[in-house]
Amino acid sequence: MNGIPMEHGLILASILFALGLVGLMMRRNMLFVLMSLEIMMNSAGLAFIVAGTRWGQPDGQVMFLLVITLAAAEASVGLALLLQLYRRFKTLDIDAASRLRG
């Protein structure tokens, strides 16, 4: 009994990446932008896992651990910015972030 074919895993990863990219470009709310970035990072991690499984190498799993670490750091910095944006301007709109510099 074989597992899921590599093509199906890569198609799923590319669909998730495309959905994250669309969410990143279409939304103005910073919370949804952060969620879209997380979806994109997880889809890249899924592609690493699928490729590593296909060739029987543990490199995909190691790269996935690095992707998860990067995603956690990105989420913590992004949520800190989100909190400051909401405290100062009472909005989560991305355009208000450009006024945060002053």
From Swiss-Prot:
<keyword id="KW-0472">Membrane</keyword>
<dbReference type="Pfam" id="PF00420">
    <property type="entry name" value="Oxidored_q2"/>
</dbReference>
<comment type="subunit">
    <text>NDH-1 is composed of 14 different subunits. Subunits NuoA, H, J, K, L, M, N constitute the membrane sector of the complex.</text>
</comment>
<feature type="transmembrane region" description="Helical">
    <location>
        <begin position="4"/>
        <end position="24"/>
    </location>
</feature>
<keyword id="KW-1003">Cell membrane</keyword>
<dbReference type="GO" id="GO:0030964">
    <property type="term" value="C:NADH dehydrogenase complex"/>
</dbReference>
<keyword id="KW-0520">NAD</keyword>
<keyword id="KW-0812">Transmembrane</keyword>
<comment type="function">
    <text>NDH-1 shuttles electrons from NADH, via FMN and iron-sulfur (Fe-S) centers, to quinones in the respiratory chain. The immediate electron acceptor for the enzyme in this species is believed to be ubiquinone. Couples the redox reaction to proton translocation (for every two electrons transferred, four hydrogen ions are translocated across the cytoplasmic membrane), and thus conserves the redox energy in a proton gradient.</text>
</comment>
<protein>
    <recommendedName>
        <fullName>NADH-quinone oxidoreductase subunit K</fullName>
        <ecNumber>7.1.1.-</ecNumber>
    </recommendedName>
</protein>
<dbReference type="GO" id="GO:0050136">
    <property type="term" value="F:NADH:ubiquinone reductase (non-electrogenic) activity"/>
</dbReference>
<keyword id="KW-0997">Cell inner membrane</keyword>
<keyword id="KW-1278">Translocase</keyword>
<dbReference type="InterPro" id="IPR039428">
    <property type="entry name" value="NUOK/Mnh_C1-like"/>
</dbReference>
<dbReference type="GO" id="GO:0048038">
    <property type="term" value="F:quinone binding"/>
</dbReference>
<comment type="similarity">
    <text>Belongs to the complex I subunit 4L family.</text>
</comment>
<dbReference type="InterPro" id="IPR001133">
    <property type="entry name" value="NADH_UbQ_OxRdtase_chain4L/K"/>
</dbReference>
<feature type="transmembrane region" description="Helical">
    <location>
        <begin position="30"/>
        <end position="50"/>
    </location>
</feature>
<keyword id="KW-0874">Quinone</keyword>
<dbReference type="GO" id="GO:0042773">
    <property type="term" value="P:ATP synthesis coupled electron transport"/>
</dbReference>
<keyword id="KW-0813">Transport</keyword>
<keyword id="KW-0830">Ubiquinone</keyword>
<feature type="transmembrane region" description="Helical">
    <location>
        <begin position="62"/>
        <end position="82"/>
    </location>
</feature>
<dbReference type="GO" id="GO:0005886">
    <property type="term" value="C:plasma membrane"/>
</dbReference>
<keyword id="KW-1133">Transmembrane helix</keyword>
